[in-house]
Amino acid sequence: MLPGERPNYQPPMLETVKRLLGIGKKSTGIKLVISCEKLEKRVALLENNRLEEYTIERETDRNIVGSIFKGKVRNIEPGIKAMFVDIGFEKNAFLQFWDAIPAALDSGIETINRGNGNAKKKAPRITHKDVPNIYPVGSDVLVQVKKGPISNKGPRITTDISLPGRYLVLMPFNDQFGISRKIEDPKERERLRKILRELEVPEGMGVIMRTVGAGQRSRYFVRDLSILLEQWAQVQKGLEEKPAPACLFEEPDLIERSVRDFLTDEVDAVIIDDAKAAERMQNLVGQISKRAKKSIQHYTGVQPIFECFGVKAQIDAAFHRQVWLPCGGYIVIDETEAMIAVDVNTGRNKGAKDMEKTILQTNLEAAEEIARQLRLRNIGGLIVADFIDMKNRKDQQAVYTRIKERLKRDKARTHVLPISQLGLMEMTRQRANESLASAVFIPCPHCSGKGVIKSPMTMSVELQRALHSVMRKHQEIVHEVRVTVHPDLLNRLRTDDEEHLIDIERRYAGRLVFRADPTFHQEKFVISDAKTGEELKA
């Protein structure tokens, strides 16, 4: 060891070389598990065998977020500062005026000077007032889907086109250069700035270096840029040749997106249960990095791949309303049209003498789990978390810091506010597609999506009310009435409400005959003439 040298110290250049060559890489415990079936493909991201992200794609329901279309403006709504564009779907896409204006780079991106020394005259500034004149009704417009159809709403689109690659994002109509702020090492950022300025990006276009570009060689960026420029050339060709509406660039399928978005240097292994898909993935990765190609493995086990890696049970738990925490507390997640509500409870965690410590521990674990569940369930929009009340402002700050730190792993943009005086934390999460639950479930035909049905007591009251009306109306003609109900309601009628039914028979000099039908909805009953079978109405 040289005098004054720190133990285990590695010169910066040596560290960079080792990172590029993959020497001494430590296991991160992160792996991708991919299941390929005829109707559905599924990707699970595991960190130390814990499910962190889960994506599904079905053959009949392909993802369109990121796809580029040549659309036609159908109508303009100045009142809501938006227009509706036909891009070939049942519902027209929604284009807000500010999404039709050239945008600045996101706050998560550091803007880099191109360094070409050519002072270019700035283009006239466009405002939302100019949009109707630029894109009148009937005109063609090049757009990209930024948010897929959710519920009864059509896709949301933008004219701010971007093509994401493995290491770069190409912006054909934005000449800015940028580097992801998630790359924090100052020396690495300086190295990437130099590479960025040396890239041969066509005039008028810009590029952003993605987080995954940290530690990568210059040639990887050159190769990635070449692929993106070729993609853009195909878009331009389609723009000239195809009539609107037309799809000019289709967002890659789940396998290709997994290579682009998930397969980073932090991923130890990719395990996939389909030989053809594994080979295709290796070929895709091989275009960029031969070293990363070795991490892709074909699973040949007899047991289903998601069961083998413990994914299935974790997916099932992802649909539960209540999620338990290690300390014994739990959170409750309710997904509504307007917002996502999360409630935090101490649950079984009540035995500690120091209640403040118990509450802090529960809230800290809840902060971790809330961030994980948002990503896992792919829920976004407005989220309000009701934490257990903390008197100490320092404890509130600790919970706020914890959830902010945990959300750094999330690719979706998030914005979090500190805990309010009411103990509520408000946050937003970017919502590009429908949630996992919305993709998997449909509204319950029994409760119409409410999640509740009327109790047997309520149904008994409503039935007795109906019997009074029916028997009063038909008492001169019908003397025997058949009542068909669900077994749960019949059980209530024969026990708690038997005297009330006898009173009805006495009052109208008639006879009631009850029949249970297990196929009936719990809220359904039928009153009919026992002799003719004709249904009786009040």
Q: What are the roles of these predicted feature ranges?
A:
Residues M1-I157, G533, A538:
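Charged, low-complexity terminal tails
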Residues M1-Y9, F177-K312, F319, N433-A538:
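Charged, low-complexity intrinsically disordered tails
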Residues L20, G29-L32, E53-I64, I126-N133, ...:
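Active-site phosphate-binding and catalytic loops of NTP-dependent enzymes
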Residues K25-K26, D61-I64, N75-P78, N133-P136, ...:
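Conserved catalytic network of the ASCE P-loop NTPase/AAA+ motor domain
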Residues L45, I56, L95-G115, K121, ...:
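P-loop NTP-binding catalytic core
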Residues I56, T60-I80, K122-P149, R189-I195, ...:
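Phosphate-interacting basic helix/loop segments used at nucleotide- and nucleic-acid interfaces
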Residues K81-M83, I87, K91-A93, G148-M171, ...:
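Conserved glycine-centered short motifs in functionally critical loops
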Residues V137-D140, P243-A244, S295, M339, ...:
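Loop/turn-to-beta-strand initiation segments
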